[in-house]
Amino acid sequence: MAQAVEEWYRQMPIITRSYLTAAVVTTVGCTLEIISPYHLYLNPKLVVQHYEIWRLVTNFLYFRKMDLDFLFHMFFLARYCKLLEENSFRGRTADFFYMLLFGATVLTGIVLIGGMIPYISETFARILFLSNSLTFMMVYVWSKHNPFIHMSFLGLFTFTAAYLPWVLLGFSILVGSSTWVDLLGMIAGHVYYFLEDVYPRMTGRRPLKTPSFIKALFADDNVVVARPPNAGLGAGARFGAMGADPQAQ
């Protein structure tokens, strides 16, 4: 069992493996009280006035306490991050890293701006961690790149992957969870999808071209990961019971 887990971990592409590792280490560290979530959450005042710049990064690494929901989120993160990196961004590690950087920037900007708008500022002030939103963004982008994969929800009904974000949003409403996390991820995902995929087809210009200094960070990355035969199988959502129809491949 341990060997299988180690092999699964080693086969992950570099960005997925790094993000998953950082998320697990951060959450475990908080659970063991080695570090405190109070030193990690997004706080604009502390960032600007006290130069606690690390909060711009650490708020994307903490997934709350370690419980069943945490395990679902880790599976969710590992699956869709891996699917994107191995397929849509196959051989383009720098572009994938830039996508995550862009998404994190958009999410942070939305929360900061929302916190300055009357009537909704209190809602945004309660958003302390954006890790789930960034994961949801990846799900949204994946669904846009794979809209025709057939999936099922708890065996109750089937749908195509294009509707996956909306199904997850509906599930959040059903169980009484805050929908803001999902909505922010959808907004960031759609902004990226429009600027990277739709706008270039309309105008011939690509506004999100990955900067050369980011490409230089991954200049030695020549590994192209082959797509696994069941890459489209299973959505593995927070409820852990969603799967794709293999006949749709």
From Swiss-Prot:
Pfam families: DER1
Source organism superkingdom: Eukaryota
Alphabetical UniProt keywords: Endoplasmic reticulum, Membrane, Transmembrane, Transmembrane helix
Cellular localisation: Endoplasmic reticulum membrane
Family of the protein in this entry: Belongs to the derlin family.
Entry GO terms, CC: endoplasmic reticulum membrane
Membrane topology reported for the UniProt record: Multi-pass membrane protein
Side of membrane Lumenal, spans: 43-96, 144-152
GO terms for biological process, alphabetical: endoplasmic reticulum unfolded protein response; ERAD pathway
Transmembrane segments: 22-42, 97-117, 123-143, 153-173
Iron-sulfur recorded as keyword: no
Membrane topology (Cytoplasmic): 1-21, 118-122, 174-249
InterPro entries named in the record: DER1, Rhomboid-like_sf
Gene, per the UniProt record: DER2
Record-linked PANTHER family: DER1-LIKE PROTEIN, DERLIN (PTHR11009)
Function per UniProt: May be involved in the degradation process of specific misfolded endoplasmic reticulum (ER) luminal proteins.
Protein's UniProt name: Derlin-2
